[in-house]
Amino acid sequence: MSKTYAEINDRIKKGEVVVVTAEEIIDIVDEKGVKKAAQEVDVVTTGTFSPMCSSGAFLNFGHAKPRIKVQKAWLNGVNAYAGLAAVDLYVGATELPEDDPLNKVFPGEFKYGGGHIIEDLVSGKDIRLKAIAYGTDCYPGKELDTWIKLEDLNEAVLTNPRNAYQNYNCAVNLSDKTIYTYMGTIKPKLGNATYCSAAQLSPLMNDPEYKTIGIGTRIFLGGGVGYVIWQGTQHNPTVARTEGGVPKGGAGTLSVIGDLKQMVPDWLRGVSFRGYGATLAVGIGIP
């Protein structure tokens, strides 16, 4: 049974829409069959909430007096990329403070990084902004040391060049020593297995051939509203697939964007991976 977006939106307005998760629909189909389930259910929601290093935020903090064209900048000691316009910055989820000991004492703890900056912003915390510049006629300022909050910024935009990986890896360790990776700590001699997939809830596993999700799709992002803007980096739809079209390895990805000011720390969390680095866990939901 097919339903149009207009029909479903009309049921939403009337308060009659039936929404279930991709996990719940499995039991409904088992009990009632595909046809009956399609008749009764209007929307099936998918989602994922996991660390994604390919994350960051564009920030515009407005002009100071005197005006400054930022050359280098730091947020709570974490480097922010300033190679944009005068007071535009980009903070990447994996960026670290310049004084972080890193892996000099192995394994490093990586207690604070760009992902934590983003979480602190959406938590309403004050962030120390330090910036330097070489000075120009139109931007004479050479130094800035101030405190900012998310509500003070002109714009704050969360960007994920890659997220919602379709059928990602499982990691095991066959060696005799513990290894520290972006998949977490992996114990020797098959002592554990770590994976990163939302399984039956995974957005692109429920749309394996990308027939529903695409450019312009409106999504839940970090607790707010976001949009799919392009295929994600490392998008590879040509991997081997099952007869049903499900990829046998890592395949599709999504590039997404959203207004950071709408988001909440419940769905944006700074993460520290021992021996590897810092990142950001991002909550995504796609109907």
What positions do the PLM features span?
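Anaerobic metallocofactor- and corrinoid-dependent redox/one-carbon enzyme cores
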Residues: 2-287
